[in-house]
């Protein structure tokens, strides 16, 4: 019997990419996106529409910089979904949860103390007047009611929890494409149909799947797919 080295499944293989080129590419993306995030946060009055040129200027700046958060999710997916080639899952959790969890907790604690001590010195902080306490902090921390701009931390932790599972299937290009199509249909397609007048009652029971309704997951997977297979 003749031996053969041909693979059993003829799956498309990831395209080789030079590491130095990847690092420069990622650095540029992160730097540009950081500036874009600052721009987004300095034009927040855009969410209070007014018929003025100043509001139109802020709207234009928001439109130019809105790519920042999707890029951060894509870069995270590009860097993390192949972590098994570098270290075990225990190291992944220890590195990622410690780094993000520490920043999230300390940042929330600092904001909570500042808002409670100076409730009338920060926009929207009046609700913190006279409520300082451990229980109140825990409740607000668990529900992202301290500094709502920290929503990114909550989203990225969700993706970290999914990463060990996703990392087992991302080496199969067809599986990644299936996940991308499914997540895009649920997280983007369904809300879009509602904008065009479709009553959500007709699709929510059948297609309201929390796992695939996350736009963050869509960008997370897309980052790995674009980097690896394009």
Regions found by a protein language model. Give the residues of each.
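Specific transmembrane alpha-helix
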Residues: 69-82, 154-167, 194-230
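Membrane-cytosol interface segments of multi-pass membrane proteins
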Residues: 1-189
């Amino acid at each position: 019997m003749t031996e053969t080295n041909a693979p059993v499944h003829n799956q498309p293989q990831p395209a080789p990419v030079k590491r130095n080129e990847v690092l420069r590419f990622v650095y540029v993306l992160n730097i540009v996106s950081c500036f874009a995030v600052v721009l987004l946060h300095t034009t927040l009055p855009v969410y209070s529409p007014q018929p003025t040129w100043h509001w139109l200027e802020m709207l234009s700046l928001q439109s130019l910089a809105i790519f920042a958060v999707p890029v951060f999710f894509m870069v995270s997916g590009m860097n993390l979904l192949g972590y098994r080639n570098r270290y075990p899952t225990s190291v992944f959790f220890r590195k990622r949860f410690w780094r993000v969890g520490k920043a999230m907790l300390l940042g929330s604690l600092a904001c909570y103390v500042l808002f409670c001590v100076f409730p009338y010195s920060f926009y929207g902080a009046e609700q913190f007047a006279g409520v300082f306490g451990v229980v109140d902090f825990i409740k607000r921390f668990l529900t992202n009611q301290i500094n709502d701009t920290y929503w990114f931390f909550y989203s990225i932790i969700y993706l970290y929890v999914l990463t060990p599972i996703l990392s087992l299937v991302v080496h199969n290009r067809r599986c990644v494409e299936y996940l991308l199509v499914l997540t895009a249909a649920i997280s983007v397609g369904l809300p879009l149909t509602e904008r065009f007048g479709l009553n959500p009652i007709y699709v929510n029971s059948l297609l309201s799947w929390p796992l695939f309704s996350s736009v963050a997951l869509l960008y997370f997977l897309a980052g790995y797919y674009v980097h690896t297979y394009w």
